Amino acid sequence: MQIQENISLKTYNTFGIDAKARWFAEFANVEQLNELLSLSIQHLSSNIQHFILGGGSNILFTSDINSLVLKNEVFGIEKIREDEDHVYIKTGAGENWHRFVLHCIENNWAGVENLSLIPGNVGASPMQNIGAYGVELKSVFQELEAFHLQEKTNYVFGLKDCEFDYRQSVFKERYTNQFVIMNVTFRLNKKPVFNTSYGAVEQELEKMGVKELSIAAISQAVINIRSSKLPDPAVIGNAGSFFKNPIVPRGIFEDLQKNHPGIIGFDNNEGNIKLAAAWLIEQCGWKGYRKGDAGCHANQALVLVNYGNASGAEIFELSEQILQSVKAKFGVVLEREVNIVSREA
């Protein structure tokens, strides 16, 4: 275990941005993390900043990072208990999310099949309350263990402690860079409750010729849909959906409908309407746009891409232009789903 200097992060982020970390190290457990923190203070700087890196699938580096980047390599999937209806699976934060989902399906543990093929690691899943096709992480979340970087103490966070919301949790803003998520425990169902409420999933299942519904079939349907709409980061650098779908009061949505009859919105069951950000962006003419190696994907306007050698700053500037144009045309303020990481991370 050692601390390296001036390491390229190009292969550690799905955008493929060639930012450099001033210092870089990996840890596989709390003991190694503690040792690295002590070493960094003793030998590098007493006020050194630390940045925790997971799968690198939801970040955009806009510059080199003048911090110690600590790569989370905590692995392991363990069934810790079960009852008549549920199994409780404790999973290392460094585990790949999609591989974890496939492991659950192989064991007939239900609840995460709709979240298939979401990029990133398990540790990031509660940070942003990942969700897709009618399911959010919070519906299968039991608890997580996290290590406080300053106090050097372990904490357990339950469902209420995490304050989950749409693509949001306490770790994304309030506790940014204060805690390291070490593992997450999921409560999965022994008796599946299928969720095919999204039309695209039902259509894909029909296209697949599925006669008997199963979690494996739903997972494959989701994989097919995502593969057809979203570019593979191994081929074209991207972080999936760059923007959140904005939520507006019903009255605002009705006003928007008068001026923009084709606007797409979905009831979020809380009296508000979730707008389709991709539609807003497409109406502003950004779908398929490219300047240099930074662009907006031709098949999915929510996805910003690096066609090769774009800098993080160039992609960020493109996102700024998109935000401004959507606000000017619709009066709607988009939020980035991707975390922006600058020099002093």
Language-model regions, residue ranges each:
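Beta-rich strand-turn-strand
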Residues: 109, 312-318
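A generic alpha-helix structural signal
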Residues: 33-40, 101, 202, 219-222, ...
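Residue-level preference for nonpolar/small residues embedded in alpha-helices
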Residues: 32, 96, 273, 318-319
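Anion-binding (especially nucleotide phosphate/pyrophosphate-binding) glycine-rich loop
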Residues: 1-151
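Phosphate/pyrophosphate- and phosphate-bearing ligand-binding catalytic cores of soluble enzymes
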Residues: 3-5, 10-17, 59, 154-304, ...
